[in-house]
Amino acid sequence: MTNQVQNALSTIYEGIEYSLEFITPEQAQFYLTKNFDNNRKISRNNLEELKKEMRNSRFILSDSAICFDTDGTLVNGQHRLLAVVQTGMTQPFLVVKNMPSKS
C-alpha cells in the first residue's frame, strides 16, 4: 500500500473507536434508543433465533460489530441488541463508534 493510499485511509477513518463490550440489557436498551428511523423492520425469525442461541449458550462473539455512525446513530445491530433486552442476558460484542455515514 502506498503512503498516499495510507494517508487517505487514515483521514477517512480518523476518530473511529472500537472496543469489546459486555452489553447488559440496560445498555442494549439505551443503544436501541439511538436506532435510526428508516432501519429495516425487525425480523421475528432472526430475533427468535438469536434469543434461542443466547438462552442455549450458543451465541458467540462474531466479526459483525454493533456500529454507530459519527452522529451516534445505531446503524448495525438492532436484532442482537433487542435479543439481549428480551432475554435479559449480557453478551459480548465488538462495538464500533464514529463510522463514516453512508452517503
Describe the predicted segments one by one:
Residues K102-S103:
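Hydrophobic alpha-helical segments and helix pairs
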